[in-house]
Regions:
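Glycine- (often His-adjacent) and acidic-residue-rich active-site loop
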Residues: 56-94, 140, 223
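Activation segment of ePK-like protein kinases, specifically the conserved APE
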Residues: 24, 180, 256-257
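Terminal peptide-recognition signature
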Residues: 17, 21, 36, 54, ...
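Crotonase-fold acyl-CoA enzyme core
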Residues: 93-206, 241, 246, 253
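Conserved CoA-thioester-binding segment of acyl-CoA-metabolizing enzymes
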Residues: 1-55, 93
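C-terminal alpha-helix plus adjacent terminal tail
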Residues: 1-12, 47, 59, 167-173, ...
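Hydrophobic alpha-helical membrane-association signature
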Residues: 32-35, 84-87, 117, 190, ...
Length: 257
């Protein structure tokens, strides 16, 4: 599904999702969140798509957060705020637990809800000009437990508190240092770098990737909620597969699998 503000396509086993609202730095409305859910569910069912890349149009922003021009309609009362928050939390959870690897390709501003979205992806790759911020403290906004926990888990408690309490922006180098992003590349090579990175993942054994993704999800749960039986089953499926037999033989024969 593609809409005016949410674009999607697939190429060589990689699904691409673009936030297409560049005149507002790709600020997101309820309609865009709804479209994202539909696209993700379509990509989930498509067996030819093995990796997902999310990015923002225009070359200035990944996603700058909620569309403030829509606040009177979407976040002007307690009821509408609860509805909006419920919607975004559902999207974040869908992305965080997505069964295929997800990559946020960040070029420019990654702010507020855009950062919340990015940290739900497995991998974040940004250009040198990228800027990150969580301006809630300047806007009197509140974030739920899950959003704050993700930042604590990724950045560490001290850096996450500094980041949230001051609402200061950090640059790409700082983001790399604190683990907010995994790769930092020049702007003119970003698209090709991410394309090759995604292709590398898509060419690896799908059962192993699926197992590692799901086991990673279980690791981040509270210990009492982890499905360790599922983890063992996923690992066993890998060893029982034809992919494993071929990979083992290729290794022994010193040839590509």
């Amino acid at each position: 599904m593609t809409t005016e503000k949410m674009l999607s396509r697939s190429e060589n086993g990689v699904g691409y999702i673009t936030f297409n609202n560049p005149e507002k730095h790709n600020a997101v409305s309820i309609e865009m969140w709804d479209a994202l859910v539909t696209i993700l569910n379509d990509f989930k069912k498509n067996k030819d798509i093995r990796v997902i890349v999310l990015n923002g149009a225009g070359g200035k922003s990944f996603v700058s957060g909620a569309d403030i021009s829509k606040f009177d309609k979407e976040r002007s009362s307690k009821e509408t705020v609860l509805n909006y928050n419920k919607k975004t939390q559902m999207v974040y959870e869908l992305l965080e637990t997505f069964p295929k690897p997800t990559i946020a390709m960040i070029n420019g501003y990654c702010i507020g809800g855009g950062l919340n979205l990015a940290v739900c992806c497995d991998i974040r790759i940004c250009s040198q000009k990228s800027k990150f911020a969580m301006p809630a403290a300047k806007l009197s906004l509140g974030y739920p437990f899950s959003s704050i926990k993700r930042l604590f888990d990724i950045m560490g408690p001290g850096m996450a508190k500094h980041f949230m309490f001051t609402a200061d922006r950090i640059n790409a180098d700082e983001a790399l240092t604190c683990g907010l992003v995994q790769k930092l590349v020049p702007e003119d090579t970003l698209v090709n770098f991410v394309k090759e990175y995604a292709l590398t993942i898509s060419k690896n054994a799908p059962l192993t990737i699926r197992a590692m993704k799901q086991i990673g999800i279980e690791i981040l749960k509270n210990p009492d909620d982890r499905d360790l039986v599922l983890c063992e089953e996923l690992a066993s499926v890998c060893f029982d597969s034809e992919d494993y037999k071929e990979g083992r033989n290729a290794f022994m024969e010193k040839r590509p699998a």
